[in-house]
Amino acid sequence: MLPLSTKAPKFSLPNALEDSTVTLDDFPHAKAYVLAFVCNHCPFVKLIRDHLADFGNSALKKDVVTFAISSNDVENYPDDSPAKMVIEAKEAGYAFPYLYDESQEVAKSYKAACTPDFFLFDSNQRLAYRGQYDDARPGNGKPVTGNDLQLALDAVLAGKEVPEPHQPSIGCNIKWKQGNAPDYFG
């Protein structure tokens, strides 16, 4: 697990939604950064997809940048391909970048384990929260609220520490390429 206060690992990833490459440093005036490791096919992500789109789009109005990142092996999971990412983002209404981590190195650098998995960084790109979106799970009947991430974001924007413990994310394992699973996985 990436320790709190860790400086955000650098990345440069293609945005599936437009012909561009995106980095954290493209947004130097952001008040916070949300990284959401997601994919298209996982039922845990599908459950929160529309709410996450609203969350990320609303956060933009507060100068909070959200990045959705897909790190799955698209050879074995073609529903997660960049072409399908474009369709998914348009259907959900993402107004934020949906990035493709083909090498899976970004997921490894953040120690992401599942989809969805959330990392919130303050304006200095220091990790303030890592964990779940909320308590909703496929089949558990709990409403999707984004409460855990929203409370963490509210604390960061107020200049406060996010209270611990942070509830770990639960979802589908990142689909690592053959022989590419990190040491922390499994």
Where on the chain are the PLM-derived regions?
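A short, charged, Gly/Pro-tolerant segment at domain boundaries
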Residues: 168-180
